[in-house]
Amino acid sequence: MMNIGSTICAVATAQGGAISVIRISGPQAIQVTDRIFKPAKGMPFSERAPYSVSYGRIIDSEGSVVDEVVTTLYRAPKSYTGEDCTEIACHGSTYIANRILALLIEAGCSMAQPGEFTQRAFLNGKMDLSQAEAVADLIASTSAATHRLAMNQMRGGFSRELSALRDRLLHLTSLMELELDFSDHEELEFADRSELQQIATDIEQVLSLIHISEPTR
């Protein structure tokens, strides 16, 4: 069960790579990271400016070094989730990633549920529902066509296209209603029939795009 308002953590990259990125998001994200991350030099991590990137070490409760990492700080609302957020880039060992997650949980984090970072981004207005769905589509894309569609959707292109199509339909509907009001005057024609045909064609194109993306859901 997702607990909105808590501070969550999870590995945000696929396993098996040279680098793993652990994302922490929530009201205590910066403070929790500060408890286990010691910058190599300079001020404490929690006092650094937004978007700052810091090199240092992850230290456990006994003072032992777990890994040398690079950590990035994002302050709300300018982050992926719209919350305070940090990202720890560590070596790609599953053991190291799990050790860091365990330390974060000891420091007050909860493990994120699948899709929870994107859910928070949606709830905080960082993306609309279409864009949130596109994140899953992008991850699952298996062809160039589905990848292009997901990227366009994630950038808001699909949402804008649907919104524009809705506006055109509403405008045409109002003109057709106006024609009904003046039905006694057969010579009056407000709605452009060719525009109606074009809208129908555009709707078919949108439906075909949705059909392409369905297998990735």
Q: Language model features by range: what are they?
A:
Residues 1-148, 152, 156:
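A glycine-rich (often HGG/GG-containing) alpha/beta subdomain
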Residues 126-209:
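Long, non-coiled-coil amphipathic alpha-helical linker/lever segments
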Residues 208-217:
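Residue-level detector of conserved catalytic or cofactor/ligand-binding positions
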